[in-house]
Amino acid sequence: PDKNSSSAETAVFDLIDPSFCDVVIIQSDRFGNYDFCKALAQKYREMGLPVISLGENISDCINFEYRRGDGFAVIVSHMVKYHGYTNIHMIAGVKGEYYSDERIMAFRNVLSENNIPFDDSMVSYGDYWSVPAIDAVKKLIKENRLPRAIVCANDQMAVAVTNYLQDQGISVPDDVAITGFDGIETIYSADPTVSSSGIYPLTNAKEICHAVNTIFSEGYAAKNIPLFPELIINESCGCKSEKHRMKFNSSASYNELMNKFYRFQDENIILSNISERIQQCKSFADIADEMRKDDLMYAMTCVIKSECIDESVNPEEKIQMRFRNKMFVLYDSDDIDLKKSVGEKFIPYNMDGRDIIPNMNGFIGRCLIFTALSYLGVPMGYTCYHFSSYIPSNYYKIPQTVNMLNNALGGLRNLRHQHYLLNKVDEISRIDALTGLFNRHGFLIEYENILRGLGSNSL
């Protein structure tokens, strides 16, 4: 979400009543908007809800502090102290960005502790992406400044730089040692595997669960919980890979990648067809059948604001809505299937906004994934996915499906509003503004309509 807290992405939080929650967990370091996370946490705390913030320190919350600077210092220290590299260069993230600057400071501190002089030429910027990182290395090669070791501010850049140097005939780690940061899965499929530092997801999950259990058993108390990234030893730094930490199955990974790619292509075609059919609907009541024709939208519910089905409302107009308002259940795959099994038809209906989704208690034990629906910056509602089992491909398709619904529903709203306006213009053109009676044009049209209605009985 951007810094405008009324944006479509953030406005969805006004549509969901949080009072049913036992604990609210905000992944604040992923929002990219500290002020919004702070306001959200404050609202939930005022409601008496325990709040856990992941990544950012927020007052009166249980804050998980991800000590990324300390973690980056660990990987730099490994390069300097263990391997003895002194001719070392850093490819940072975005210039002036907080996390990038934090890692630069960690880099400088480690060099200072080991009496290695630092100057600004020892830092390049790769914007956390592959191409800028490779461009930075090309510049070093062109200027004949290729160092003995390169530490990258994230794994994406480290893998890209490793591949590029290898393609140029420069051995990693024999000629240039490389490290990354974050600990993403890709580092294990690189050749050589890339050394890194990161907080293991399982470690993170265990700590969060422990914090939640503590709230239930001992009560809520705001505090800061530090989590430190762990060193991940692989081959790109000059070490042997820690095979015991994670075994990489190249065959399984390749098959999964191919399945993602081809399934993505096939599903995009299906979703495009669904989008076309939705926008050809005469009303929102017809949409559910079109969405369920293809067996792609299962285990999901789509709830929109009631004014979205009102053709007279301008689709570009932002109307403030709260969870106490009525919401419109546009689609419910489970209900559709149930009614179909007994020969009935699903009919969209209004629902109390405080219910969030129909039959919510029936999904106890499932992970509910909510995503905002918006079009041209105007919030429309949300979808809720409630898969009963963990099949990765189900989760991969969520962004595709939501993007399709955003465009299809937004497009339909525009078309229906245009149809409404045309009818109003036509209606105005038939009526005399002074008397309210048909004018000549309106009378002739109405007369012709009456004749058509009479058919062969007309005189």
For the regions a language model picked out, list residue spans one by one.
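Active-site-proximal structural segments of metal-dependent nucleotidyl cyclase/transferase enzymes
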Residues: 446-459
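Signal-transmission linkers at sensory-effector interfaces
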Residues: 240-280, 421-427
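Flexible loop/turn connectors
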Residues: 138-242
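Conserved nucleotide-binding and Mg2+-coordinating catalytic segments in signaling enzymes
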Residues: 424-446
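Hydrophobic alpha-helical segments within soluble ligand-binding/sensing domains
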Residues: 59-90, 101-109, 130-138, 158, ...
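Amphipathic alpha-helical "output/dimerization" segments
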Residues: 390-410, 419-423
